[in-house]
Amino acid sequence: MKLFEVLSPPKPLRADAASYVPDAFRRATTKHKGNLGYLGRGAFAQVYSHKNRPASAFKVGIGDGDNTYLKYIERASQNERWKSNPYLPRVHSQKNYKDPGGGASYVVEIEKLEPFMDLEQEEVEAIIDRAFHSLPKDKYSDLPRQYDVVEALQRAAAGYSDAIKNIKDKKLLQALAIIGNIGKSLYSVGKKTGPYARENARMHLDIHTSNVMIRRTSVGAQLVITDPLV
């Protein structure tokens, strides 16, 4: 994959775009090695900065249209109303690749965000005040408040009524509804019956402290749910 192909000015998303490039994943991470800065990794992707695009991050991953991350960013960018939701990531471009051997990979250019865990606790409390009616701290826990936030987000996305009712920010409710609906559609939970249908959907939610990040704004730190599904 030629990483420079996504370093041109951002274009509208084309989820069906595919180019047959041998060794796509390997080439993506070596073509611009001198300009890339490693930011982090997950099970199937790595994230890089590029010195010529300081406001962007580039996620290079293995997978095709069935990849849960690609499904998420495509849905999040599907219409103007969702694109304006501050809790969803801002996606600048996406390119999908397949090589002759059948392997698939992708490069997604997204806004560069800050780690949620780097916030001071006062900033986390400000986020809690804006987003939730209440979120008491467990007096027996020494964990940072970020863990309370992600647990509340995970439970709301999973459809627990008490967690949903505790959210006062309508934009956050919208974002979590999008995430929950994608999880259901990906795993066909809506077509299943029986006692484990809802639990199957919940199993595929993956909202944790590494998959929630921060966008700096004029009114403070804004939560962004970056990669909530497995």
Functional labels for PLM-detected ranges:
Residues 1-8:
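Short acidic, low-complexity intrinsically disordered linear motifs used
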Residues 10-53:
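ATP-binding glycine-rich phosphate-binding loop
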Residues 35-37, 41-94:
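ATP-binding glycine-rich loop module of kinase domains
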Residues 53-54, 83-84, 99-104, 216-222:
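Short, solvent-exposed loop/turn segments that connect beta-strands within catalytic domains
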Residues 56, 87, 106-108, 203, ...:
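Protein kinase-like catalytic core scaffold
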Residues 84-178:
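Conserved structural core of kinase catalytic domains
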Residues 185-202:
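Protein kinase catalytic-loop region centered on the HRD/HxD motif
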Residues 198-230:
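Catalytic activation segment of kinase domains across protein kinase-like and atypical kinase folds
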